[in-house]
Structure formats: structure tokens, C-alpha cells
């Protein structure tokens, strides 16, 4: 069973500011509760083809995986994907102008778990949606308080 989770939030900051912060992998541990560290596997700056290793904890397990940037349109869209492990994942961020100079950000995670993980896909989907909501709220708090 495929997992496809979309979560949105409106942030009271300009789109270019929200996108620049969210698309910078070095900021991920600041707003993703489960991401503990980020290691660049390719030289900066961020570009299509860049590889970034994330160490995370999700559902009580430590996960280390390398994402590759697949698409980068500053201020509009950022796509990265990993083919590693039992749960290959594609993560997409999109940003659009919202009312009063704010930004609507959508976080989408798509994956196709294999083996035992495929049986747990409905549970994983619910947990992922819950965590994504928390993460986007944290991103909003960080950006609106600065």
C-alpha cells in the first residue's frame, strides 16, 4: 500500500523567506522534531543532484537515509527523494503566496513501503500526518517569532 501524506500551513512571512528557510537542509533539525542531524554528502550550495544524509527517529526507530535533490525552483518547489531502506520516500515542499503577505506551505511525503512495513502503511500514514502537522507548526512558530 502506498503512502501519500499532504499537510499544509499558512505562515505569516513572505514566501521567499519561508522557502529559503525550509529548503535549507541545515535548518531541518530546528523544525523537524524527528530529525536529529544532517550531513552533507555533496558540496554546497544546494542544487539538483545534491545529496544530504538525515539521521532521524520515527516510531521508536533510528533511521539514517540519504536524500537526493530532484527538483529545486527557489521560492516555489523543492523535491528530494531516497531509494534507501524498506521505505523509499519522496518529499515535496511547495510554497504559494497567501493573504496579507503570508505563505501557504505544503509538505508532501510519498512512499511505497516494502515487506512488513507495507502491512503497517495505514498506521505509518497516520503517524506521519500527525508528525508533519507538528513540524509545520514548529516551522511557523520559528519564522513568525523572528
Question: Where are the model-predicted features located?
Answer:
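Short beta-strand segments that buttress and anchor functional surface loops
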Residues: 51-57, 78-84
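Short, charged/polar surface micro-motifs in flexible loops or helix N-caps
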Residues: 59-62, 71-77, 86
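Generic structural detector for well-ordered beta-strands
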Residues: 8-12, 39, 55, 68, ...
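Beta-strand elements of well-folded, non-transmembrane domains
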Residues: 11, 58-60, 111-115
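Hydrophobic ligand-binding cavity/cleft-lining segments
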Residues: 1-47, 144
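Beta-strand/loop substructures that line and gate deep hydrophobic ligand-binding cavities in soluble
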Residues: 79-134, 139
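Short, surface-exposed coil-to-beta transition loops
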Residues: 4-6, 62-66, 88-92
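A short, structured loop/turn motif at beta-sheet edges
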Residues: 15-16, 43-46, 70-75, 94-104, ...
